[in-house]
Amino acid sequence: MNRWLRLGFACVGSIFLMFALAACKQEETLTKVKVAEVTHSIFYAPLYVAESKGFFKEEGLDVDVNTTWGGDKTMTSLLSNGSDIALVGSETSIYVEAQGAKDPVINFAQLTQTDGTFLVAREDVEHFDWDQLKGKTFLGQRKGGMPQMVGEYVLNKHKIDPHKDIDLIQNIDFANIANAFASGTGEYVQLFEPQASLFEKKGIGHIVASFGEESGEVPYTTFMAKQSYLKKNEDTAVKFTKAIYKAQQWVENHSAKDITDAIKDEFDDTDPDVIETSIERYKKQHSYSPDPLLNEKEWELLQTIMDKSGELPKHIPYNQLVNKEIAEKVTSEK
């Protein structure tokens, strides 16, 4: 009897060992990809959906996402090989190119296609008009970044000179803007979600307008990599883009509640109701790109916005910094 028991335990042990070895082998075959994200935001929901739904692993990728907090740090991480892919505003690739980069940074997959900020007023405004900003203190975003440039573009569109008609504050770090407004600085502020919805819920402020709706479609946040990386790792870039495209389609076809359930673990310090409200706002204004394609019209609007805010170092042709072939290949496959 003992002999049969020992034999049985040995067989069971062998089976477990086989499964363990198979799992290890699968892990070993996954291609590692290091991604630097400019900030950790509900605005990037499709990226987290790709992780939570296993779309990256389906493509044979082990993706490690690291938040690098700011465009400069994100680009430094990419250029110094601290990361393989960066998720950041497309304007950063233009800045790098204008400095004479020997290894250009190429945009290959778009994640968000509108600005993600909202105009929040301290006082509740029943009938908001942009003229109401004139003479008021406006807590803006960092100079040279996409939020600030889009903000100025929209203000100018409404005949408001941001440097003459309002008291513009731009010397507060991105991470401290919301706290500054909550502490009493400014009568208006430009905020991303979920902070905008959270302020409404707490009665700190009131959303009165969307910069994303006002500015039109731009390559606001894009996956990019050095040209040399894309040449050496084209297959990996294609697989990465496939996973993102799956996630984009999933987000496009699911409710804000479903998306919240998929990504809420990424934001465990945020009320799920606030996450859902934030996602609903972004879906309503089509901020989440339904596919990874970055078209030339969006690219040109980006440079128009940069030019009007005085931040465009020089005009860069679309084909010079955009690889459209990867996204086209992925979206054309059945």
From Swiss-Prot:
A lipid is attached at residue 24 (S-diacylglycerol cysteine). One of its GO terms (biological process) is cellular response to sulfate starvation. The keyword Acyltransferase does not apply. It is found in: Cell membrane. One of its GO terms (cellular component) is plasma membrane. Gene3D superfamilies: Periplasmic binding protein-like II. Keywords: Cell membrane, Lipoprotein, Membrane, Palmitate, Signal. Disulfide bonds: none annotated. Its main location: membrane. Residues 1-23 form the signal peptide. A lipid is attached at residue 24 (N-palmitoyl cysteine). It is a lipid-anchor. The keyword Membrane applies. Pfam families: NMT1_2. PANTHER family: ALIPHATIC SULFONATES-BINDING PROTEIN-RELATED, TAURINE-BINDING PERIPLASMIC PROTEIN. Belongs to the bacterial solute-binding protein SsuA/TauA family. This is Putative binding protein YtlA.
